[in-house]
Amino acid sequence: MHKVEAAETGFPKGRSVDNMQGAFAAKEYRNLFAQCGYSQEDIDRKVEEAFQTIFYGPEDQRFYHPAGEDMGYLEDTGNHDARTEGMSYGMMMCVQMDRKEEFDRIWKWAKTYMYMTEGENAGYFAWSCQTDGTKNAWGAAPDGEEYFAMALFFASHRWGDGEGIFAYSQEARKLLHDCVHKGEAPGTGRAMWDPANKLIRFVAEQDFSDPSYHLPHFYQLFALWADEEDRPFWEA
């Protein structure tokens, strides 16, 4: 890559690189590659190459696979299955790259095969499915749910809400509502966030957390976009 001078990076003159206001509030989105001295042309090319490899590269390199006419999944190549973390990360990549078709394909696959409508985990997504859609487990991993919700909110703001499962913001709010309120009635499962200490659980059935699941920058936006009754929870 060709490097450019620091003065050409586009970072606002005089602004501290450790400014704590945040990009959402400041409306200034830092380009860390540019700050390291790479040209925008090189950055755009590198990012697009990575996306094309993941989604449309050779079979021994890609891990996105179209399924039928309107669905697709991301494969965990080490286990040859589809997992909610990979599916939700894939949706986040697509909305960041303005790739609505791929986003909708992944989301439809997740809703069709991973979403659970019965049992104590109804309203959550099965964390692992075979690539034909058969569920490997009937449990959920909360990191997938929180990434699904944020990707859906971003999609709503970027493309607007559609109908059915493509009413992105409605789907996100419903998912977060279940994550917070499940278990309030006896025999209805457990919430993904502990109602007492507000910490995300490793799995709903256990009372310990996973540090890698904690995404406070997500929760700040959930406090703005989730159901109004749940916003104080996300602000806590």
Q: What does each model-found stretch correspond to?
A:
Residues M91-D98, Y147-R158, H217-L224:
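Short glycine/serine- and small hydrophobic-enriched flexible loop segments
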Residues V47-Y89, C94-M116, N121-A137:
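Internal amphipathic alpha-helical repeat/solenoid segments
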Residues F11-E49, T53-Y56, R62, H80-T84, ...:
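Extended ligand-binding clefts on enzyme/binding-domain cores
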Residues H80-M87, K135-G160:
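Aromatic-rich carbohydrate-recognition surfaces in CAZymes
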Residues M1-A7:
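Mature N-terminal, pre-catalytic/accessory segment of carbohydrate-active enzymes
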